[in-house]
Amino acid sequence: SRMKRGAALADLMGYTAEVQAQARKCADAINASGAKTVVVLDSYDAEIMAQKYGEWGCELSSGLVTATAFVAKLIEDGLLTVRNANGILAACHDDDRLARTFHEFEPIRAIAKAAGYELTEMFNHGKLAKSCGSAVALVYMPEITKKVAAGRWDDLLRTEAAAMLTANPESYICLAESVPEGKVLVDLYSALDKE
């Protein structure tokens, strides 16, 4: 089963004792593994691990890196090759937690460029990034979450981009709910499966 890290429960009910207990259990398992670096795929998890684990006395003994930064570095070092998108014009959805917590904008663009995408920017990108909702919110308030995600698509429609690129599982789940006709949603990690 998937290790509970506390992020989903925190989004649902706040930073309660139950959330902190999940975080402590996760940190203990990571620390016991002896891992030198933890690569975190979901920015929601990365945010809570980076910001809250220390406050709650369950620090990680390892380094923490987002999956986008990790993959971009592998590509830069020539350790990972990607399939070519043949110049499709796309815009990157800057995950709001990566943007606001980690000020991380370049890794997703480096991955996209390596994968052969031509890039344009939506108005709300970088530090102006907007949320597209969360997987937890999609369960308990689906209509609102779909409207929030549709707002990101509206931003894309003001560009000439054919595709929206995301590198976050929660973003992909939410954005997939309202893909406009003629546009494509791309999980950027899917570009990593072939040369």
Placement of each model-derived feature along the sequence:
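Iron-sulfur cluster-binding electron-transfer modules in prokaryotic oxidoreductases
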Residues: 1-195
